């Protein structure tokens, strides 16, 4: 036995050694295998990284090259775009020039026609009046002869009676008594006749007053309506701004929220990826450990069984116990060996399991079957799913070795049976514990726990240790039982051990799964995602659905089938992933990362989608908030944690999705509900996992597909959103701009492309999933189809929108790839698509999100939200229209709206720039259009408004980031808009001009209609237009079209009216000229945009005011006593305060509201008022109607201000004064003037004395040369007259200047008077111009002064008489220079005023309107006298000078504002032709008013002359009768109204505290008188005459402004006046070049100077109107030529007047005068030039009026330049020339006054204008306005009176009127 035992022991030891060797070898081999596998994995990773890096580098290099290429292309395109833009601008400028030239030509033609009509009407009326007077004279002579014959007969009879002497006396007594009785009867009859005539005149006056009151009431109502509409507009604008701010705030909030969400999503994504990698590593390690442990345990069991079998055979039963006891050590050894191996594996796992494990692991883990049970083929088959995991090779390596060991030690059959049969018993056992113990919980949540392992290695450790302990215990038990068992039983025991170990493995996995549950894995999601797959596979395999998923999976057929089905599912899911990946790659290279994430996400979805959310939830659980704490909980707590995490994730995802994907919101909400139901049912799962599975199947099916679908979309969207937001957040503004800009173009293509691809991918995924799930779940498909439909419907709806946008965006989206920003934008495009236009623009996000949200989720909700948003964004809009509109329509329309908005915005901007310059109508139309468009835009869907904002942003960003196409498109849009503007304005201008002409005719015809009807109609039309514009806000497209139509209609109407008032395009009449076009187009575009706004506002306001003022002044004429009744002091302070405040207030209001309906209303009102004025003029030729709009308006304002008791008192006083003035117009004026002068002397004496003295001395000196005695006498007379006139007002001083004596003297010295007037006119204009020219360039003044000096020199050379004029002219030049300083100061003041609230603009406007009137009056009157007396030589000189002045003045356009007003007034006056008012109503109102005033002055001077001299009386008698007749009364009232208006306007213009005298330097101001007195001219009253309001006005105006602004300038002006030639260069506003240029065209005078001052605006308007005036001047010159022809001598007066203008623009008026002198054509040209000067001044020599005339054209070029230099002054001068020529001839005093008037007009001081008129016409007692009216009639029938005769003045007044018409 011992040998046997030893042998057996030896064998046993041998076997033990073999076993040890085997185990050692196995261990070494395994270690080597691990090392090799680790090395292999590292090599693989390195190789993969290298290749990937190489590819990435190559791709990056290629992309960089592509980007560089795209950038180069972009830059090239931008260069091309810029070139095209420049070309486009040049073309647009040329088109604008052509259009303006065309418009000017048409307007000039219309003005010429109107002028001709006006002259014809005036001549006809005058002829009728002359005929009536002649008839009356004949009747009187006949009656006188009869009486004489009768008396002679009686006388003859008496001596025949032979009675004795005693009886002789008694006989004689009866005869004497009878004779006395007869004489008494005759006298009484004459008295009765006179009383009847007076009563008739009073009745007519009352009727006129009633009509005026009606017109005033209509104007007030219209103003109230306008104010109300303006308030409404302001409120709407404020509301719109608030809404925009609110939208901006929301946009910012949206940006912040998106940034926060992006950061949160990025953090979650990173956490998710980290958790996924950790889970993958843990699961991989756990799986490998489990596989290794099970394989080792199986091998150990096999070896144990083999050893026990051998021991059982070799050992006796007694030893068996020992043997059995000895085996635990090996087992323990093995066990401990296993643990180190596991630990070692755990350490090796990180190397073996790269992060790539994340996606494949779930697939490998999908099957609960342990890896070692799977055949090697199965593992090999499974390995492909493990992308880069070297684990399967490692697990395969030990298995063959184990198999080899088994093959060596174990019988072949046993091994085969083990392999084949082991799985069944193993699974048999596994079924029981899993179903009984662990599976219920595991199956509750997900059904597939084996797939999920603990998150932490810590979770793996506990199961491993228990597992090992269990194995140890069971192995010990099995070993003990085996020791006592038979060898055959040992095999069964071995298999039992295998089963138990398998069961323990299952338990370990279950425990792992439980821990996963405890750790809060989203088992619900897992079930939802995994359950369907497994259940589908099980159902497809025919397995019972009630069996637990694990049981089914544990079964071998179920295992294999599950593996196959899972692989199929994963493959099907992968295929969509791949497909999706490929299109995504094709979509964008930037989305490569997003695609990878999508791959992972899709793979995760394919795993079960649940894993994705488990991971995210695990991530959140891993987060300190939930992780470790929740991991410790079990069962429901875990489920609750899972729920909370799920809900949080869902909420975060939902909120993110809702913001980013509103369309998905609905499906997500349903999914959430389903998930909640699933959660609730999952909670019930522990009860019956099978039932839960059944219940879950439909839910899972429904949830899985939508969840997969939505999760895939969410992942895609989130990733895209993250990337795009990151990119978009890089520069949200740039992104927004680009996204906005490229949204329609760039985004549409990528959006459509990406949407299509996304749709394709989604459909492929859905189809593939449906195919993979078809057989198992048709119900799921149905449910999912419903979800799909729900999801797809909004998606399709939105995708359709997106596609529409994408189609539009395709072009630029292609370019978007060119630049990284565009690529970012492209990334933003899918965001916008996926966010469904939520990111379309951060601005639109709110509205668009709401729209998309509401439309996708709830169309009703969308309606509500949209309505709210739209209500906020578009208060006027009907939200239902936009909200109810389909997104497709909105999207389709949105691009169209965007384009339209772009067109509209661009066209608006361009139209504003060009048309504002072009015409008030265009500007107003566009002003109406922009609000309409804006409101329309606001009415448009928020997308459209946002798009508009985007368009603005795009335009701005396009400057920096414009893609070539975008720029080209913009240029195209610009071109289209320009073309539209050019064509439309050209065609519309032609039509409008035609309409304007026809309208003017109709107006002249309809002018007889009541103003109320017209105003009501116009206001009704305005209201209709406003209402229509508001209504248009309601309809978007229709509204736009309507707006265009309406705007075109109002534009046409307004243009017609404006053409009548001041052709809007006359604003840039000089633009066509190449130099001035370039300079002035540029400057005028800038300046005119500004100035035109100011000037147009002022012009429109002044025109409105003037119309109102005219209406008021007509009321004033009715109650002209207001002005006259007021002491000059009262009037002046009233003017200063009331007029200033009123003028300033309306100017401010109107200036502030220039762009509003006010402009149209004002323009409409102006034409209406002008028509009413024309009606008045037609009715009575009342100078009232002729009154300048500014004066009228001012007078209206004054009347309104004073309307209370003052009006009544004034009316009474006016009546009394009117009667007195009719009786003694000159004396009354003189008295007033004296009063005013006395009152003003104290104030102004100090101010104006020095300058005035110097000027007076210079003027006297000059006149002394010409004819000091006459000048002195005239000066005295004028002084007296001026005193009265100044006391009466600026107009009265004119009359007084031209009082009978001064007129006689002036007639005697018409040259001197003209000269004096000229200096005044020049001085005033120059003062004004110098202010303007100061702004522009001092050169203008100096140029004009030089021109004036040259003109004066020329005049001196031409005539010695003219020398007197020249002296005045020189004086005027000096004054002009001095006034130019004054004017500059005035302009500076005006500029300051403009800078101020707009009072000064108003003042400037008032001054402009006032100045034109005064200049006309004084210039006309003076022009008549001075012109007549000065002679043609002087007129020629003036004509040349005037032409040069016009040319010189032509340069500066700033003055057109005045001229516009002047021209507007003149045009209005001229248009009515028969009624000067009618021309006055259009634009000529002021000019006519001026001219009429000069004419009135001339008439009044005639009237004064009747007082002063027989000729004056002769001429004046005719005129005075008219003046005193209907016209005189009307003129007086009108002139008083003008005085009031001028005073008011002047007061408004001037600070309340500043005496009018300071501003006006009017005789009213003491300084003026002192200056005038000190300056005493040779005429004796040189003070009045020398300072004669013209000189004073010139000097005074210059002085007051100067004193206020340049106190020293007044002195300088006087000194300068002495040395005007030198001083001209010294003038602050006039550089020497200007003076040098005086002879030449002073191109120096260009709008630049106007830019410098607010007055530039006013004068710019005048200049524009002046340009218009020039255009009109061409007509006027035609008419004026006719007028000038019969004005023949007028040119000299015109020369004098020209000097006035020239000194303001000396050459201008001289040129004008020269035009008149050179020939009748020239005189007409001179008239036109004067008018043109005015117009040119107003035009600022936009086009030299002279140029309109033959020589006046050339001269006007020079004079235009001079005017350009002297713009405003020249304008005034030109106005003065019109009237000034007459004045000059009739009396220089008025001319000086005209200058003052002009100066005042330029300074915005109509008072001076009024004074000039009064001075000229004081004799008649008719205000200049009245005189203007009278003159207008006289113009109608120009009387060729001797140069000394006032009729000449009247004629010159007529010419002035005709000129006014011409100017019109």
UniProtKB/Swiss-Prot annotation:
PROSITE patterns: IF_ROD_1, IF_ROD_2
Region (Tail): 315-1864
Ranges of compositional bias, category Low complexity: 1713-1722, 1741-1755
Residues recorded with modification N-acetylmethionine: 1
InterPro entries xrefs: IF_conserved (IPR018039), IF_rod_dom (IPR039008), Nestin (IPR031211)
Gene Ontology CC terms: cytoplasm; intermediate filament
Effect of deleting the gene: Embryonic lethality with the neuroepithelium of developing neural tube exhibiting low numbers of neural stem cells and high levels of apoptosis. No effect on cytoskeletal integrity.
Protein's GO biological process: brain development; cell projection morphogenesis; embryonic camera-type eye development; G2/M transition of mitotic cell cycle; negative regulation of neuron apoptotic process; nervous system development; neuron apoptotic process; positive regulation of intermediate filament depolymerization
Region (Disordered): 437-492, 515-625, 680-845, 916-1113, 1129-1158, 1175-1344, 1375-1722, 1735-1807, 1841-1864
Gene Ontology molecular function terms on file: intermediate filament binding
Protein name: Nestin
Biased amino acid composition, Acidic residues: 1429-1440, 1532-1547, 1612-1621, 1658-1680
Modification Phosphoserine, positions: 312, 356, 359, 565, 575, 623, 688, 731, 775, 841, 862, 894, 963, 1010, 1021, 1106, 1127, 1177, 1188, 1195, 1216, 1290, 1541, 1565, 1656, 1665, 1745, 1747, 1837, 1860-1861
Phosphothreonine, modified sites: 316, 389
Ranges for region Head: 1-7
Keywords: Acetylation, Coiled coil, Developmental protein, Intermediate filament, Neurogenesis, Phosphoprotein
Organism the protein comes from: Mus musculus
């Amino acid at each position: 036995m011992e040998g046997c035992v030893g042998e057996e022991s030896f064998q046993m030891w041998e076997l033990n050694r073999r076993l040890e060797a085997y185990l050692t070898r196995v261990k070494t081999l395994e270690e080597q295998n691990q090392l090799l596998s680790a090395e292999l994995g590292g090599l693989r990773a390195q190789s993969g990284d290298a290749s990937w890096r190489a590819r990435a580098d190559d791709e990056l290099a290629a992309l960089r090259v592509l980007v560089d290429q795209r950038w180069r292309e972009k830059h090239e395109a931008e260069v091309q775009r810029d070139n095209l833009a420049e070309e486009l601008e040049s073309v647009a400028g040329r088109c604008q020039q052509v259009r303006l030239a065309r418009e000017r030509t048409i307007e000039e033609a219309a003005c010429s026609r109107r002028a001709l009509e006006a002259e014809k009407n005036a001549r006809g009326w005058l002829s009728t009046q002359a005929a009536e007077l002649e008839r009356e004279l004949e009747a009187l002579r006949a009656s006188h002869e009869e009486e004489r014959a009768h008396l002679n007969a009686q006388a003859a009879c008496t001596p025949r009676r032979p009675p004795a002497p005693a009886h002789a006396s008694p006989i004689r007594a009866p005869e004497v008594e009878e004779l006395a009785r007869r004489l008494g009867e005759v006298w009484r009859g004459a008295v009765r006749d006179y009383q009847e005539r007076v009563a008739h005149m009073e009745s007519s006056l009352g009727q006129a007053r009633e009509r005026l009151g009606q017109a005033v009431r209509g104007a007030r109502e219209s103003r109230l309506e306008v104010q109300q509409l303006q308030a409404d507009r302001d409120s709407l604008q404020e509301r719109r701004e608030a809404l925009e701010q609110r939208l901006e705030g929301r946009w910012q909030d949206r940006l912040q929220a998106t940034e926060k969400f992006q950061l949160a999503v990025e953090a979650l994504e990173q956490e998710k990826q980290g958790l996924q990698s950790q889970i993958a590593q843990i699961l991989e390690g756990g799986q490998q450990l489990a596989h290794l442990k099970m394989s080792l345990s199986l091998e150990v069991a096999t070896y144990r069984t083999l050893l026990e079998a051998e021991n059982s055979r070799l050992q006796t039963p007694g030893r068996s116990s020992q043997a059995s006891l000895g085996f635990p050590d090996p087992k323990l050894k093995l066990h401990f060996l296993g643990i180190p191996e596991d630990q070692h594996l755990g350490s090796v796992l990180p190397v073996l399991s790269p992060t790539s494990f994340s996606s494949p692991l779930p697939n490998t883990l999908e099957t609960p079957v342990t890896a070692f049970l799977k055949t090697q083929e199965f593992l090999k088959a499974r390995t492909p799913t493990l992308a880069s995991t070297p684990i399967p090779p490692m697990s395969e390596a030990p298995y063959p070795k184990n198999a080899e060991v088994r093959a060596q030690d174990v019988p072949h059959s046993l091994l085969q049976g083990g392999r084949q049969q082991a799985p069944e018993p193993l699974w048999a056992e596994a079924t029981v514990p899993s179903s009984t113990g662990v599976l219920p919980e595991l199956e509750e949540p997900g059904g597939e726990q084996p797939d999920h392992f603990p998150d932490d290695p810590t979770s793996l450790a506990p199961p491993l240790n228990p597992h090992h302990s269990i194995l140890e215990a069971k192995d010990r038990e099995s070993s003990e039982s085996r020791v006592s068992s038979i060898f055959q039983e040992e095999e069964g025991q071995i298999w039992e051990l295998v089963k138990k170990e398998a069961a323990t493995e299952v338990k370990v996995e279950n425990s792992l799964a439980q821990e996963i549950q405890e750790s809060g894995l989203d088992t619900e999601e897992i079930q939802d995602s995994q359950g369907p797959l497994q259940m589908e596979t099980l159902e497809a395999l025919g397995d019972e659905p009630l069996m637990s998923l694990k049981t089914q999976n544990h079964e071998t057929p179920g295992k294999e089938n599950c593996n196959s089905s899972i692989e199929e599912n994963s493959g099907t899911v992968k295929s969509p992933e791949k497909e999706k990946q490929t299109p995504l790659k094709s979509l964008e290279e930037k989305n490569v990362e997003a695609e990878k994430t999508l791959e992972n996400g899709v793979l995760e979805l394919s795993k079960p989608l649940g894993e994705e959310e488990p991971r995210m939830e695990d991530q959140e659980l891993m987060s300190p908030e939930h992780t470790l704490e929740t991991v410790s909980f079990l069962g429901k707590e875990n489920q609750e944690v899972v729920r909370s995490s799920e809900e949080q994730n869902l909420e975060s995802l939902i909120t993110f999705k809702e913001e980013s994907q509103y369309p998905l919101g609905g499906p997500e909400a349903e999914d959430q509900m389903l998930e909640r139901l699933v959660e609730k049912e999952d909670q019930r799962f522990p009860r019956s996992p099978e039932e839960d599975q059944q219940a879950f199947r439909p839910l899972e099916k429904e949830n899985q597909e939508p969840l997969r679908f939505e999760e895939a979309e969410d992942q895609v969207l989130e990733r895209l959103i993250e990337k795009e937001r990151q990119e978009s957040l890089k520069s949200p503004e740039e992104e927004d701009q680009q996204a906005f800009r490229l949204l329609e173009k760039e985004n549409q293509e990528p959006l459509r492309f990406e949407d299509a691809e996304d749709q394709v991918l989604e459909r492929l995924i859905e189809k593939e999933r449906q195919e993979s799930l078809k057989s198992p779940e048709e119900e799921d498909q149905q449910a999912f189809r419903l979800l799909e439909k729900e999801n797809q419907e909004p998606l399709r709806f939105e995708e359709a929108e997106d596609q529409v946008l994408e189609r539009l965006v395709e072009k630029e989206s292609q370019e978007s790839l060119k630049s990284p920003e565009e690529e970012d934008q492209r990334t933003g495009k899918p965001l916008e698509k996926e966010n469904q236009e939520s990111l379309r623009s951060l601005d639109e996000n709110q509205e668009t999100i709401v729209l998309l949200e509401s439309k996708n989720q709830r169309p009703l909700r969308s309606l509500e939200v949209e309505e709210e948003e739209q209500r906020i964004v578009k208060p006027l809009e009907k939200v239902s229209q936009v909200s109810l509109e389909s997104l497709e329509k909105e999207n389709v329309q949105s691009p169209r709206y965007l384009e339209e908005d772009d067109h509209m915005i661009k066209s608006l901007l361009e139209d504003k720039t060009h048309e504002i310059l072009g015409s008030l109508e265009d500007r107003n139309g566009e002003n109406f259009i922009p609000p309409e468009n804006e409101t329309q835009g606001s009415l448009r869907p928020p997308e459209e408004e946002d798009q508009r904002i985007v368009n603005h942003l795009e335009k701005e960003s396009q400057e920096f980031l414009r893609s070539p196409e975008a720029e080209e498109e913009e240029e195209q849009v610009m071109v289209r808009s320009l073309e539209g503007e050019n064509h439309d304005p050209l065609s519309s201008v032609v039509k409008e001009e035609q309409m304007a002409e026809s309208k003017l005719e109709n107006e002249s015809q309809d002018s007889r209609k009541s103003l109320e009807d017209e105003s009501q109609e116009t206001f009704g039309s305005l209201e209709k237009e406003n209402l229509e514009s508001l209504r248009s806000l309601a309809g978007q497209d229709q509204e736009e079209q309507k707006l265009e139509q309406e705007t075109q209609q109002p534009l046409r109407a307004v243009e017609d009216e404006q053409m009548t008032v001041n052709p809007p395009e006359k604003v840039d009449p000089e633009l066509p000229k190449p130099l001035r076009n370039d300079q002035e187009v540029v400057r005028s575009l800038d300046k005119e945009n500004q100035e035109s706004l100011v000037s147009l506002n002022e012009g429109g306001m002044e025109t409105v005011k003037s119309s109102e003022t005219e209406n008021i002044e007509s009321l004033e004429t009715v109650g002209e006593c207001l002005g006259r009744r007021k002491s000059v002091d009262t009037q002046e302070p009233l003017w200063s305060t009331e007029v200033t405040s009123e003028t300033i207030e309306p100017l401010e209001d109107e200036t502030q509201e220039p762009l509003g309906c006010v402009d149209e209303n004002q323009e409409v009102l102006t034409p209406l008022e002008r028509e009413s004025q024309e009606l008045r003029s037609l009715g009575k030729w009342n100078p009232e109607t002729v009154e300048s709009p500014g004066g009228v308006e001012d007078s209206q304002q004054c009347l309104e201000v004073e309307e209370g008791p003052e009006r009544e008192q004034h009316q009474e006083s006016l009546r009394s004064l009117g009667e007195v003035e009719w009786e003694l117009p000159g004396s009354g004026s003189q008295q007033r003037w004296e009063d005013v002068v006395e009152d003003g002397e104290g104030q102004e004496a100090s101010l104006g004395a020095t300058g005035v003295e110097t000027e007076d001395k210079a003027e006297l000196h000059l006149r002394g040369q010409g004819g000091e005695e006459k000048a002195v006498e005239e000066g005295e007379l004028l002084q007296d007259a001026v005193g009265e006139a100044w006391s009466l007002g600026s107009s009265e001083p004119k009359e007084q200047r031209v009082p009978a004596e001064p007129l006689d003297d002036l007639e005697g010295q018409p040259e001197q008077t003209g000269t004096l007037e000229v200096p005044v006119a020049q001085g005033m204009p120059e003062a004004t111009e110098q202010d303007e020219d100061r702004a522009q360039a001092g050169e203008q003044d100096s140029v004009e002064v030089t021109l004036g000096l040259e003109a004066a020199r020329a005049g001196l050379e031409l005539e010695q008489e003219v020398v007197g004029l020249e002296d005045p002219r020189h004086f005027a030049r000096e004054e002009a220079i001095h006034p130019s300083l004054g004017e500059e100061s005035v302009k500076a003041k005006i500029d300051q005023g403009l800078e101020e609230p707009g009072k000064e603009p108003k003042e400037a406007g008032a001054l402009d309107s006032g100045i034109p009137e005064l200049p006309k009056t004084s210039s006309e009157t003076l022009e008549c006298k001075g012109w007549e007396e000065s002679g043609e030589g002087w007129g020629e000189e003036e004509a040349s000078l005037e032409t040069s002045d016009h040319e010189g003045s032509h340069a500066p356009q700033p003055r057109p504002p005045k001229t516009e007003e002047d021209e507007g007034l003149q045009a209005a006056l001229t248009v009515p032709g028969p009624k000067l008012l009618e021309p006055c109503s259009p634009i000529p109102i002021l000019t006519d008013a001026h001219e009429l005033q000069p004419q009135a002055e001339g008439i009044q001077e005639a009237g004064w002359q009747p007082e002063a001299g027989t000729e004056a009386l002769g001429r004046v008698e005719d005129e005075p009768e008219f003046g005193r007749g209907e016209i005189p009364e009307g003129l007086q009232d009108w002139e008083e109204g003008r005085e009031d208006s001028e005073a008011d306007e002047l007061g408004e213009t001037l600070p309340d505290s500043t005496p009018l005298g300071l501003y006006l330097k009017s005789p009213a101001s003491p300084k003026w008188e002192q200056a005038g007195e000190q300056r005493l001219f040779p005429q004796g009253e040189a003070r009045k005459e020398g300072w004669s309001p013209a000189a004073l006005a010139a000097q005074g105006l210059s002085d007051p402004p100067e004193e206020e602004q340049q106190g020293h300038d007044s002195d300088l002006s006087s000194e300068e006046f002495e040395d005007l030639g030198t001083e001209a260069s010294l003038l602050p506003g006039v550089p020497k070049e200007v003076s040098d240029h005086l002879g030449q065209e002073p191109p120096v005078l260009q709008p630049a100077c106007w830019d410098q001052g607010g007055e530039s605006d006013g004068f710019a308007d005048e200049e524009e109107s002046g340009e218009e005036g020039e255009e009109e001047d061409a007509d006027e010159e035609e008419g004026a030529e006719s007028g000038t022809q019969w004005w023949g001598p007028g040119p000299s007066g015109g020369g004098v007047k020209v000097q006035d203008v020239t000194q303001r623009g000396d050459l201008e008026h001289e040129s004008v005068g020269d035009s008149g002198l050179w020939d009748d054509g020239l005189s007409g040209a001179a008239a036109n030039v004067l008018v043109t000067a005015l117009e040119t001044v107003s035009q600022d020599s936009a086009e030299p009026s002279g140029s309109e005339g033959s020589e006046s054209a050339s001269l006007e070029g020079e004079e235009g330049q001079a005017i350009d230099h002297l713009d405003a002054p020249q304008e005034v001068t030109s106005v003065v020339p019109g009237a000034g020529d007459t004045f000059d001839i009739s009396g220089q005093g008025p001319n000086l006054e005209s200058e003052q008037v002009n100066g005042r007009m330029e300074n915005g001081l109509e008072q001076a204008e009024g004074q000039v008129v009064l001075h000229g016409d004081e004799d008649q007692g008719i205000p200049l306005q009245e005189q203007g009216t009278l003159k207008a009639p006289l113009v109608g029938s120009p009387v060729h009176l001797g140069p000394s005769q006032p009729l000449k003045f009247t004629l010159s007044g007529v010419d002035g009127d005709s000129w006014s018409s011409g100017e019109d």
